[in-house]
Design a protein with these regions (language model features):
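N-terminal glycine/serine-rich phosphate-binding loop of ATP-dependent small-molecule kinases
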Residues: 1-94, 219-228, 405, 411-413
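Short alpha-helix plus adjacent loop in nuclease-associated cores
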Residues: 100-113
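Short beta-strand-loop/turn "lid" adjacent to the catalytic site in phosphate-handling enzymes
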Residues: 42, 62, 66-98, 123-130, ...
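Active-site core segments that coordinate phosphate-bearing ligands/cofactors
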Residues: 6-7, 111-123, 137-149, 153, ...
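Small/polar loops that bind or transfer phosphate-bearing groups
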Residues: 9, 95, 99, 131, ...
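Glycine-rich beta-strand-to-loop/alpha-helix junction loops that act as flexible
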Residues: 77-81, 207-208, 255-258, 390-398
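Short, well-ordered amphipathic alpha-helical segments that serve as non-catalytic structural scaffolds
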Residues: 52-65, 183-189, 372-377
Length: 440
């Protein structure tokens, strides 16, 4: 009998349920459900609707069982750094999104207790104002941690709601900025220094672990029973597993709402040069994902929403423009502006001529992203003291031929675009490995 597996891959802008199976040695997949995901602005803060998210998770499982009654297992991956605090096993609302500005006020205080250079040496995680370490400290200052009894990252929370088993998965935990790069566990010295309750940060679990089965009430609701397992719950970790590279250690670019450019390494690099370059050492499946976070398609997504046109139409508009001025896509001003187009125009006007048309603005975004990829690639080669001729691109951005061509131009490398659901494939690959009795 054909063995089917369900990957639930949720990004910051959408979620998808993808069923996968092996057919004559080839992985086949079918998307059975897709739903939008977006940030909610409430009382001046940016939040996730975690209840709607879980409802969509269940609806997608229901759709999967309707078409594929025999599903061997399922797993969930999502974006990193965000989490749910629990009291009496109930969420403490709101569930903030990483784009909320509440961390800005506490970052100096955290660094006065633990200078960033010291944090980086221990964790190897790059500075981002939204890292969980700053979010949790903001929660402590606001009194939210005092009432909390538990802490689960978003995918851990959703998996727990399905099977009733709480687990803290390694790859996603590393994104918090609280995991020691050498021990691969939450760092008690960091927790103690910041006054974070150690009981909420227990031993980590490796991807490829079976958590259990759907709880009876959930199974009845979705119309089927299956095993629930841990994949690499950080979507980028699953994406790297899903990229079919001829060279196992070739650089990759996971191109989605965020763009992550890096390479697999056996050991972390936590020296001062790496710290200054703001590269990160995130957990992978048996390796370190040494990479740089770049703003990514978020800027393009915001512009697309404002213009109300398709991504394909944006590409065609860009082709008509000779305007190629570059701006810093990683600047904090582009994280959650009220008006992305106005913010881009203002940034470009500060250093020269502003874009005259939307075509100019779009073309500038594409060139700026590709330029940033080129800079990050050169930093990667310098920091690792290695040289490569290829860059593998997966994710939504791999479908954008114009952006791929510009990336090849600015990196000076051969670009291998893989317009596949790399994250879902990595998620499925880990599940299949468990089913076959192997190790991940």
């Amino acid at each position: 009998m054909q063995k089917n597996y369900l990957a639930i891959d949720i990004g910051a802008s959408s979620g998808r349920h993808i069923v996968g199976w092996m057919e004559n040695g080839v992985l086949r997949t079918e998307e059975v459900y897709r739903f939008p995901n977006s940030v909610q602005r409430v009382d001046g803060h940016l939040e996730w609707d975690i209840d709607s998210l879980f409802a969509n998770v269940k609806q997608g499982i229901r759709e999967a069982f309707a078409k594929y009654p025999n599903i061997e297992s399922l797993s969930i991956d999502t974006w990193a750094v965000d989490y749910v605090l629990l009291k009496n096993d109930q969420p403490i609302y709101p569930v903030y999104t990483y784009r909320d500005s509440r961390t800005q006020a506490v970052i100096p205080e955290v660094h006065s207790i633990l200078p960033f250079e010291q944090l980086y040496q221990r964790t190897g995680i790059q500075f981002q104002p939204f890292n969980s370490i700053y979010q949790l400290y903001a929660d402590k200052k606001a009194g939210r941690l005092a009432e909390a009894e538990d802490f689960l990252m978003i995918p851990e929370y959703l998996l727990w709601k399905l099977c009733g088993v709480k687990a803290r998965e390694y790859t996603n935990a590393t994104s918090t900025g609280l995991v020691n790069a050498q021990t691969k566990e939450y760092d008690p010295e960091i927790l103690k220094a910041l006054g974070l309750p150690e009981a909420m940060f227990p031993k980590l679990t490796a991807p490829g672990t079976v958590l259990g089965s759907l709880m009876p009430n959930i199974a009845a609701e979705v119309g089927g029973q299956t095993k629930v397992v841990l994949c690499a719950t950080h979507d980028t970790a699953s994406a790297v597993e899903g990229i079919p590279m001829e060279q196992g250690d070739a650089p990759f670019l996971s191109s989605g709402t965020w763009s992550l450019l890096g390479v697999k390494l056996a050991k972390p690099i936590t020296n001062p040069e790496s710290c200054r370059a703001n590269f990160t050492n995130e957990g992978g499946v048996g390796y370190i994902r040494y990479l740089k976070n770049i703003m990514g398609l978020w800027i393009i997504q915001c512009v697309q929403k404002q213009l109300g046109i398709s991504f394909a139409e944006m590409v065609e508009l860009a082709k008509t423009s000779p305007y190629t001025r570059i701006f810093d896509v990683n600047a904090a001003r582009f994280s959650a502006p009220q008006d992305m187009r106005a913010e881009i125009r203002a940034a470009l006007a500060e250093t020269g001529e502003a874009p005259a048309t939307d075509a100019d603005l779009i073309n500038s975004v594409y060139h700026s992203l590709a330029y940033c990829y080129g800079e990050a690639f050169r930093e990667l080669e310098s920091l690792t003291e290695q040289h490569w001729d290829k860059l593998y691109i997966a994710g939504g951005g791999a479908k954008n031929a114009t952006l791929n061509e510009l990336t090849a131009h600015y990196t000076g490398k051969q670009v291998v675009a893989l317009p596949i659901e790399a994250t879902a494939i990595g998620n499925l690959k880990i599940q299949m490995s468990i089913s076959e009795g192997g190790t991940v």
